[in-house]
A protein has these predicted regions:
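TRNA-recognition modules of translation machinery and tRNA-sensing kinases, especially anticodon-binding
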Residues: 6-305
Length: 305
């Protein structure tokens, strides 16, 4: 991967930054043991101010995207197999998706799939493009494979919440939208005082169907390096071809649309970056101005223990 651009100066504080679960525990904000008893590994309970912060980030991200002209959408959290195979490869499906036993339904791994699926087998007037949607949803993923020490806590989990954005547009506009989408995520993180960078994925690292992709990474003061918090992808006409998403022009000519998607914010990983970058020497966590209206005016969170 090649670094495209860096936004904000990474800061290494002059005090030790604890692991994110330790920070959360200082606020009585996470219970992994109870979650393990209830659902197994890869789940969590968020409590108190940490749970409130989680909801605040989602609410802020929703309003952020609405203010940028996106239509807010609450999509289905389950999708049929013809939609699954239209938006991703079988290998990706097998590694990610949970199937509902006895039903032709899968739990979504991202709301991108159900938002893109909204347009299955449609012919859309060119004059109505682009369609720009943003949604909040829970996401469910198998997350197969071994996980390292840095993936404990809420870093890699089976259930999480995410604000997503998708675009359906004319082919000649897709690269313009690609740049707009990842810049939305960068702007969101910077508004919360979190340094980020973008990495362009090489062709060998691209998932099936993707034409171009960029990862957004946030700075971790504890690890003194960046870690992935989202990705933006241009899928060209690959999904549109599989799902039958067509466009009709003024001359009645029909052609395939282009589809794009991008993570606005996934709070579990974003919370890691947020807590580390806003942690103070006394253990309190500063609340950036943009989040204060969603936190009842709170300017900082104070540890409970």
């Amino acid at each position: 991967k090649r670094q495209v651009e860096r936004f904000g100066e990474p800061v290494v504080p002059d005090f030790e930054v604890p692991y994110h679960t330790d920070i959360m525990e200082s606020f009585n904000g996470i219970d992994l043991d109870s979650a393990r008893k209830v659902a197994g590994n890869g789940f969590y309970y968020l409590m108190g101010d940490i749970a409130r912060l989680h909801s605040a980030v989602i609410s802020y991200a929703r309003d952020f995207m609405i203010n940028r002209g996106f239509t807010y959408c609450v999509p289905p959290f389950m999708i049929r197999s013809d939609v699954v195979t239209g938006v991703m490869s079988f290998a990706e499906m097998d590694a990610m998706m949970y199937k509902i036993e006895g039903e032709d339904l899968y739990l979504i791994g991202t709301s991108e799939h159900s938002m893109i699926g909204k347009f299955i087998d449609t012919v859309n007037k060119e004059e109505n493009l682009p369609y720009t949607l943003t949604s909040y949803s829970p996401c469910f993923r198998k997350e197969k494979g071994a996980h390292g020490l840095e993936e404990r806590g809420v870093y890699r989990i089976h259930q999480f919440e995410k604000q997503e954005m998708i675009v359906i547009c004319k082919p000649e506009d897709s690269m313009m939208w690609y740049d707009k989408l990842w810049k939305n995520t960068v702007d969101l993180f910077r508004s919360m005082d979190i340094p980020v960078r973008t990495l362009e994925c090489c062709s060998g690292d691209l998932a099936d169907l993707k034409v171009k992709s960029v990862d957004v990474e946030a700075w971790s003061p504890r690890q003194k390096k960046y870690f992935e918090v989202g990705s933006c992808s241009n899928l060209g006409d690959a999904q549109a071809r599989r799902l039958g998403i067509r466009v009709v022009g003024p001359d009645k000519t029909k052609y395939l649309a282009h589809t794009l998607n991008n993570t606005v914010v996934a709070p579990p990983r974003m919370l890691i970056a947020f807590l580390e970058n806003n942690l103070q020497a006394d253990g309190s966590v500063r609340i950036p101005e943009v989040l204060r209206p969603y936190m009842g005016g709170m300017e900082k969170m104070v540890p409970k223990k």
